[in-house]
Design a protein with these regions (language model features):
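Sec-dependent N-terminal signal peptides
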Residues: 4-13
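Sec/Tat signal peptide C-region and signal peptidase I cleavage site
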Residues: 14-18
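Active-site beta->alpha N-cap acidic-glycine motif
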Residues: 19-134, 234, 250
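C-terminal domain-boundary segment and adjacent tail
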Residues: 58-60, 159, 220-291
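Acidic carboxylate-rich catalytic motifs and surrounding loops in phosphoryl-/glycosyl-chemistry enzymes
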Residues: 68-70, 161-162, 246-247
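Catalytic domains of cell-wall/extracellular-matrix polysaccharide-remodeling enzymes
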Residues: 74-76, 83, 100-241
């Protein structure tokens, strides 16, 4: 944290940075990551978690753009999306199946986007936003073909400049027994917020002190139902103003993408996850929830 504080002081010394701290909040994988509506208990939990996200946004007067996986809308969750839009927030297309364009051909991917478009058209706001799952834009063959389709169908690509990697922390929270999560969240929250802030400082470094606007990626998940308000307050305490995605795209910071050579997939389940490997943030093993 000391290194982060020193870097922050150096950035503050630059007049251009001190005067232009603006950020747009974007939320992927709506309606709600790894949620079920198959029992009254699951319905209640999903509703409470989603409502917490809405409340954090509305109580802090923060604009947001959400990206919907159309194939992940469980029975009874359409109302979540209506609630999000009716609260004044934007909704965009995040495909039907959450495919990784770095791993498939353009035609199948385009069909998946079109399928989502048909389902989401009653809810999507203007301008029509699209975000690539996994931030994967494809290779030299698939990328231009998909981009041409999106352009012809009046989509605006929503880039990311700060990736919270929250799915890694969310996976850790799912490993904690349900009744113990409230007590555990404060410990996890500290690490999570520190990580987001380190990602923010890296983004500001990439911007090279230019007066650009940042775009933060988080997910509609269990973790952020607890912590979104803290994320918002952290940015406000550091002097950031929250703006719309439309405003951010007028002069965005350098965007993050996943090269076509990288094929990492994060998978999701409901209350339990398992698997192997090492998490570079938490130092734990396990599968990762949707990115």
């Amino acid at each position: 944290m000391r290194k982060l504080s020193l870097l922050w002081l150096l950035l503050l010394a630059c007049n251009s940075f001190a005067q232009t701290r603006e950020i747009a909040l974007t939320i992927d994988d709506l309606p709600l990551v790894a949620s079920k509506m198959d029992t009254p208990g699951n319905q209640q939990r999903a509703t409470e978690r989603f409502n917490k996200i809405i409340e954090a946004l509305t109580q802090n007067h923060v604009p947001a753009t959400g990206f919907v996986i159309a194939g992940a809308i469980a029975k009874g969750q359409w109302v979540f999306l209506e609630q999000f839009r009716n609260a004044g927030f934007e909704l965009g297309n995040h495909t039907y199946s959450h495919y990784n364009l770095n791993q498939m051909n353009a035609d199948k991917y385009i069909a998946d986007v079109a399928r989502a478009d048909k389902i989401l058209s009653p809810l999507m706001t203007e301008p029509k936003y699209f975000r690539y799952p996994y931030l994967a834009e494809g290779n030299k063959v698939s990328k231009p073909k998909v981009l041409n389709y999106l352009t012809e169908n009046h989509y605006v690509i929503a880039p990311v400049t700060i990736d919270s990697k929250d799915f890694r922390f969310n996976e850790q929270l799912y490993k904690v027994p349900y009744r113990s999560r409230e007590a555990y969240i404060n410990k996890l929250k500290t690490r999570y917020l520190e990580y987001i802030w380190s990602q923010t400082l890296k983004a500001e470094q990439r911007a090279k002190d230019q007066p650009v606007k940042q775009i933060l990626l988080i997910h509609a998940n269990l973790l952020n139902s607890y912590v979104l308000g803290d994320i918002i307050q952290m940015y406000k305490q550091h002097g950031y103003t929250f703006i719309t995605l439309t405003e951010a795209l007028k002069n965005p910071a350098p965007a993050l993408t996943v090269p076509a050579s990288e094929n990492t997939i994060e998978k999701g389940t409901d209350e339990n996850t398992s698997g192997g490997g090492t998490d570079d943030v938490l130092g734990i093993g396990g599968q990762l929830l949707f990115h």
